[in-house]
UniProtKB/Swiss-Prot annotation:
The lineage of its organism: Bacteria, Pseudomonadati, Pseudomonadota, Betaproteobacteria, Burkholderiales. The gene is rplR. This is Large ribosomal subunit protein uL18. GO terms for molecular function: 5S rRNA binding; structural constituent of ribosome. This is one of the proteins that bind and probably mediate the attachment of the 5S RNA into the large ribosomal subunit, where it forms part of the central protuberance. CDD domains: Ribosomal_L18_L5e (cd00432).
Length: 121
């Protein structure tokens, strides 16, 4: 019997395979209790084209004195930021890779913000 973590990792591997067949860059999301990370990875998986996280100094300053990166408001900031960076790198369309995390809460907030900022997925 697989643990929750093993199940999530298995789902993420299967998703990565499906996304690789599409031939578009992928927007990956990783979340921890304290931070959320987003990367735009090239279609062949060899390069990180853009990245944003709540661990960045500029983002921590914009979050205020509390500096909490583990909430939906912080995820929304990261979604807007990753969309800006991806557009600056010339990327308009991505495949969303949630890495096995449920599409709820912080992951959903990041995805919605990235869509609002102009990324298509």
């Amino acid at each position: 019997m697989l643990t929750k973590k093993e199940q999530r990792l298995r789902r993420s591997r299967q998703t990565r395979i499906r996304i690789a067949q599409q031939g578009v860059a992928r927007l990956t999301v990783n979340r921890t209790n304290l931070h959320i990370y987003a990367n735009v990875i090239s279609d062949d998986g060899s390069k990180v084209l853009a990245s944003a996280s709540t661990a960045e100094a500029e983002v921590r300053q914009s979050l205020g004195a509390a500096g909490k990166g583990g909430n939906a408001a912080a995820a929304r900031i990261i979604g807007l930021r990753i969309a800006e960076k991806a557009k600056a790198a010339g990327i308009q369309k991505v495949a969303f890779d949630r890495a096995g995390f449920a599409y709820h809460g912080r992951v959903k907030a990041l995805a919605d913000a990235a869509r609002e900022a102009g990324l298509q997925f």
